[in-house]
């Protein structure tokens, strides 16, 4: 993985004595890749790349976005029209969001069709399903943040869906909205979920997902 010139350098030796870089490098480069693996096995990795793009562009927009019902829409317009390359950052965020959902769906189909969910990879499949739910939840919460007509009514419809659940439905609706109706508390909740709760959740389950894949390897052909 590293050239002889690099491994012989004093800087490399200093880090290797403390972090065992060479052992980590050997473990990565010696991992067996089955011969049946093709481009469709890259869909999960592409989904990860889309998430990283989402994280970077979303973080950039938090410097200008204002999560209030009176300023949310105008702050998005400011990002699009006044911030240097703001239109590009937001557009990339939107495009990569759509791409992430698409790649996630294709990845789920690939795993299912190739039997990658079978023993001993049941837990890997379960964490993947959880990641899929979080990904869709990202889309739902992010869709509302511009707080335009589309976002507002999307929130109103989505947050009203749990009302059909017996016994606890009305309580769930009130929890999502932060009250009886859609308003500032609703936007605050969705913003918090989108920028803090879901990123942490997806990072934790991604780590678990990748560690299990690393431990068990790629499933064999059907």
Swiss-Prot record:
Q: Which CDD domains match?
A: Cytochrome_b_N
**PROSITE patterns to which the protein is assigned, alphabetical:** CYTB_NTER
Cofactor(s) recorded in Swiss-Prot or TrEMBL: heme b; heme c
Give the domain of life.
Answer: Bacteria
Where it sits in the cell: the answer is:
Cellular thylakoid membrane
Which molecular function terms from Gene Ontology are attached? electron transporter, transferring electrons within cytochrome b6/f complex of photosystem II activity; metal ion binding; oxidoreductase activity
| Residues binding heme b 1, per UniProt | 107, 209
A biological process (GO) of this protein is: respiratory electron transport chain
Q: Does the keyword Mitochondrion apply?
A: no
Q: Name one Pfam family in it.
A: Cytochrome_B
Which keywords has UniProt assigned to this entry?
Answer: Electron transport, Heme, Iron, Membrane, Metal-binding, Photosynthesis, Thylakoid, Transmembrane, Transmembrane helix, Transport
Q: Which GO terms describe its cellular component?
A: plasma membrane-derived thylakoid membrane
Q: Which residues bind heme c?
A: 42
Cite the Gene3D superfamilies for this sequence.
Cytochrome Bc1 Complex, Chain C
Q: How is the cofactor bound?
A: Binds 2 heme b groups non-covalently with two histidine residues as axial ligands. Binds one heme group covalently by a single cysteine link with no axial amino acid ligand. This heme was named heme ci.
Q: What does this protein do?
A: Component of the cytochrome b6-f complex, which mediates electron transfer between photosystem II (PSII) and photosystem I (PSI), cyclic electron flow around PSI, and state transitions.
Similarity comment: family membership:
Belongs to the cytochrome b family. PetB subfamily.
Misc remark:
Heme 1 (or BH or b566) is high-potential and absorbs at about 566 nm, and heme 2 (or BL or b562) is low-potential and absorbs at about 562 nm.
Query: What name does this protein carry?
Result: Cytochrome b6
């Amino acid at each position: 993985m590293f050239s002889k010139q690099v491994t012989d350098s004093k800087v490399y030796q200093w880090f290797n004595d403390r972090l065992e870089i060479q052992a980590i490098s050997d473990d990565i480069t010696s991992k067996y890749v089955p011969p049946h693996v093709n481009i469709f096995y890259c869909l999960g990795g592409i989904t990860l790349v889309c998430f990283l793009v989402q994280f970077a562009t979303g973080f950039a927009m938090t410097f200008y976005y204002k999560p209030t019902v009176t300023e949310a829409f105008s702050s998005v317009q400011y990002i699009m029209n006044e911030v240097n390359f703001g239109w590009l950052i937001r557009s990339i965020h939107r495009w990569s969001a759509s791409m992430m959902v698409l790649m996630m769906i294709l990845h789920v189909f690939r795993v299912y069709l190739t039997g990658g969910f079978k023993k001993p990879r049941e837990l890997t499949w379960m964490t993947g399903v959880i990641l899929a739910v979080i990904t869709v939840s990202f889309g739902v919460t992010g869709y509302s943040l511009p707080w335009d007509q589309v976002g507002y009514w999307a929130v109103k419809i989505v947050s009203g869906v749990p009302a059909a659940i017996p016994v606890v439905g009305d309580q769930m609706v009130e929890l999502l909205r932060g009250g009886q109706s859609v308003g500032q508390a609703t936007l605050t909740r969705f913003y918090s979920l989108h920028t803090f709760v879901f990123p942490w959740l997806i990072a934790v389950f991604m780590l678990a997902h990748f560690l299990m894949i690393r431990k068990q390897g790629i499933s064999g052909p059907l």
